[in-house]
Amino acid sequence: MHFVIDRDIFVQNVNHVSKAVSSRTTIPILTGIKIVADHEGVTLTGSDSDISIETFIPLEEGDRQNVEVKQEGSIVLQAKVFAEIVKKLPEQEIEIHVQDSFVTTIRSGSSVFNLNGLDPDEYPRLPVLEEDHVFRLPQKILKDIIRQTVFAVSTQETRPVLTGVNFEIEDGILTCTATDSHRLAMRKVPVEKNDDELQFSNVVIPGKSLNELSKILDENEELLDIVVTENQTLFKLKNMLFFSRLLEGKYPVTKNMIPKEAKTSFAVHTKAFLQTLERALLLSREGKNQVINLKTLGDGVVEVTAITPEIGKVTENVATQGLEGEELRISFNGKNVIDALKVVDSESIHIAFTGAMSPFVLSPTDHDQSLHLFSPVRTY
């Protein structure tokens, strides 16, 4: 194998596939990146047990030449070292040449590296998926969905299915849900689909996979195809395939958890409320419990307090809009609510309570496409 390639494009693609490579794998060849050069361009692949990423660099795009393939072939090179090398090379062009026994020369300007490669035939093949369940989303929307849900997945492996985000489609609406059993984040969005009958549920994508995918997605309206099978999902971008395994197990039915009516409710400015809770958390965080207390005072005002006996107390009154219903005193995990407020994209939010010991709902005031649910904290 022998090719010359543009350094910037190569570095970008090596970075993408490196996201799928784990140094802790039990299969030695998966610590490497597979590189294939043929008459169409160069293909890079990185994989671990959860994620596989394949990117393709065409010979040319528009009037720009990306790569010149002088001899077709393939090699597997140790990912961590290889990624560091190509980042640091001095010139705009990189030449890669595989000789006998998989020894690979990487040349740029006066810099020359010789790396020991591995047999590419031993690298596992990527799955070929049946494309029966396919739908489309703009990259920006998917990036938003991930940002607004994945923070709420569980970090505990005691219930592995809760470490992922549940995707389901019904009546042309994609609903994505994440919960760690103390909080829940949900986002809904209409989708383009190739089949009017397309419906599925219990498609649980690991949070780790979605975090890595989010780093690759652009903030644009370019559509990507999402393919769902029994145990894998595939995100098809231009010149990139991103595979993720699905988590096994039955995801809890969350629709019934969300209260339909409220005993106390109000609206509040998102940023102002976030800043109030962040100030309160300064004390409750020191007490390690992260508990913040909220009490209705009347005249549209609620009081936010946090107490750490050995340090002190903070109290702040917050003006609300439309405060109505019963008097309320409630305690909650401040960090969980702050995490949710940081991903809300509306200027104001509505908060609905059904009692001091019942879950409460936080949602944007200007649309019904997302909501957050929180369990209160018992403080006595």
UniProtKB/Swiss-Prot annotation:
GO terms for biological process: DNA strand elongation involved in DNA replication. SUPFAM superfamilies: DNA clamp (SSF55979). Transmembrane segments: none annotated. The keyword Nucleotidyltransferase applies. Pfam families: DNA_pol3_beta, DNA_pol3_beta_2, DNA_pol3_beta_3. Keywords: Cytoplasm, DNA replication, DNA-binding, DNA-directed DNA polymerase, Nucleotidyltransferase, Transferase. It is found in: Cytoplasm. The keyword Transferase applies. InterPro entries: DNA_clamp_sf (IPR046938), DNA_polIII_beta (IPR001001), DNA_polIII_beta_C (IPR022635), DNA_polIII_beta_cen (IPR022637), DNA_polIII_beta_N (IPR022634). Gene3D superfamilies: 3.70.10.10, DNA Polymerase III, subunit A, domain 2. One of its GO terms (molecular function) is 3'-5' exonuclease activity. Its main location: cytoplasm. One of its GO terms (cellular component) is DNA polymerase III complex. Confers DNA tethering and processivity to DNA polymerases and other proteins. Acts as a clamp, forming a ring around DNA (a reaction catalyzed by the clamp-loading complex) which diffuses in an ATP-independent manner freely and bidirectionally along dsDNA. Initially characterized for its ability to contact the catalytic subunit of DNA polymerase III (Pol III), a complex, multichain enzyme responsible for most of the replicative synthesis in bacteria; Pol III exhibits 3'-5' exonuclease proofreading activity. Forms a ring-shaped head-to-tail homodimer around DNA which binds and tethers DNA polymerases and other proteins to the DNA. The DNA replisome complex has a single clamp-loading complex (3 tau and 1 each of delta, delta', psi and chi subunits) which binds 3 Pol III cores (1 core on the leading strand and 2 on the lagging strand) each with a beta sliding clamp dimer. Additional proteins in the replisome are other copies of gamma, psi and chi, Ssb, DNA helicase and RNA primase. Belongs to the beta sliding clamp family. This is Beta sliding clamp. The gene is dnaN.
